[in-house]
Swiss-Prot record:
Annotated organism of origin: Shigella boydii serotype 4 (strain Sb227)
Name listed for the protein in its UniProt record: Common pilus major fimbrillin subunit EcpA
A GO cellular component annotation in the UniProt record: pilus
Keyword Oxidoreductase: no
Subunit record text: Self-associates. Forms filaments. Interacts with EcpD.
Name of the gene: ecpA
Length: 211
């Protein structure tokens, strides 16, 4: 199973500016009475990535997410941008195999706001136009039925080789639904509370070598 770390945010520049101006005003008061001067308005933001490191070159199937996802709210469309999430797949060849199948299934996809609101966002996952869902497997490769995997086709060609084979492809991730408090659904994302949502999107991959 592989997962992407995600953050999503809605930010209002006006609020940030007001906080900065207030801080400057307080400093002015504490440092004495002087001639009033115009002050520059600045803002600063920090992005943080969760990080781990792992190496596995012996398992029969290894899937690695390449990069993280960051959804940003766009006021003009009252929605969030979509993201392309790349992944790398490595398999061990089985010289006795006559067919190979690779499927994916969504495991987790909920982001929760990092405050007391309880607001949530659900992330949809799409693979080459097919939804990856929790209720069933999405076929990515099925050599017995002529599904050779597109960008993952090196796996379809190398599943019965005597060495390891790798290939890369990607999912499309979008925000498909949300709540204001964990229960009340929203139809207009502009009504969501301000803040940052965080969580993991996990997709399980299953590989089958048939002899």
């Amino acid at each position: 199973m592989t997962h992407w770390d995600i953050t999503s945010s809605i930010q209002l520049g006006k609020k940030c500016n007001e906080k900065k101006v207030l801080a400057i005003a307080l400093v002015t008061v504490f440092t004495g009475m002087g001639v009033a001067q115009a002050a520059d308005v600045t803002a600063q933001a920090v992005a943080t990535w969760s990080a781990t490191a792992k190496k596995d070159t012996t398992s029969n199937l290894v899937v690695t997410s390449l990069g993280s996802l960051a959804f940003q709210y766009a006021e003009g469309i009252k929605g969030f941008n979509s993201q392309k999430g790349l992944f790398d797949v490595a398999i061990e060849g089985d010289s006795t195999a006559t067919a190979f199948k690779l499927t994916s299934r969504l495991i987790t996809n909920t982001l929760t706001q990092l405050d007391t609101s309880g607001s949530t966002l659900n992330v949809g996952v799409d693979y080459n136009g097919a939804a990856v869902e929790k209720t069933g497997d999405t076929v990515m490769i099925d050599t017995a039925n002529g599904v050779l995997g597109g960008n993952l086709s090196p796996l379809a060609n190398g599943y019965n080789a005597s060495n390891r084979t790798t290939a890369q492809d990607g999912f499309t991730f979008t925000i498909i639904s949300g709540t204001t408090n964990g229960t009340t659904a929203v139809t207009d994302y502009s009504t969501l509370p301000e803040g940052i949502w965080s969580g993991d999107v996990s997709v399980q991959f299953d590989a089958t070598w048939t002899s």
